[in-house]
């Protein structure tokens, strides 16, 4: 629950920070006409994840890129040391970036600018853009809500897609860890139940089924406690008569 809440907080913080940076740097506006509209957001596999689309469009693709990178950098700087240590593996899993805690923000910026400023992205003239997101799973019993900010340019949306990939991957990791923990707890309950059953079975056997030795002990216990003088009297009464 704590990890899930932490991820959702980070997602909300990043989206808020990106919106602020786009407004300040790229003069983006929610009311501006967007050259690109978002059509569909498709998950390869989805379990409890939602994506909301928010328009913050402008024509300055370069400024959009800088704003998104700057927002991510600021949020990363505010993470705990434990969260920072976890971040490089997320970028490797989501974006195939080999990085570490010391260089992660610079490596992320380099990746974004190389990928999203490529000719394949810049020259991709589209009106309606559909996005495909990898697997996303919310922690058990939770719903994870992500926000995709439509910048209105292919370059800006490319950067936003990379951010979304990392965030959904983080949710997937948390979900997997919590599911494993829940499975382990179930195993403990099962083992405990088996032990209790065996204990009850042992005592039931003691109550209703007796071994031969136990039966002999019970029979002996039922015999009256005869005083030794009784045996002497019995002997003399039953002794043969000598002629």
From Swiss-Prot:
Record lipid sites (N-myristoyl glycine): 2
Disulfide bonds listed in the record: 34-57, 49-136, 116-158
A GO CC annotation given for this chain: membrane
Subcellular location: Virion membrane
Main location: virion
Keyword field contains Cell inner membrane: no
Intravirion-side positions: 205-243
Annotated GO biological process: symbiont entry into host cell; virion attachment to host cell
Post-translational modification: Myristoylated.
Spans within the Virion surface topological domain: 2-183
TM segment ranges: 184-204
The entry's keywords: Disulfide bond, Host-virus interaction, Late protein, Lipoprotein, Membrane, Myristate, Transmembrane, Transmembrane helix, Viral attachment to host cell, Viral envelope protein, Viral penetration into host cytoplasm, Virion, Virus entry into host cell
Membrane topology summary: Single-pass membrane protein
Description of what induces expression: Expressed in the late phase of the viral replicative cycle.
Similarity remark: Belongs to the orthopoxvirus OPG095 family.
Protein name per UniProt: Entry-fusion complex associated protein OPG095
Gene symbol of the encoding locus: OPG099
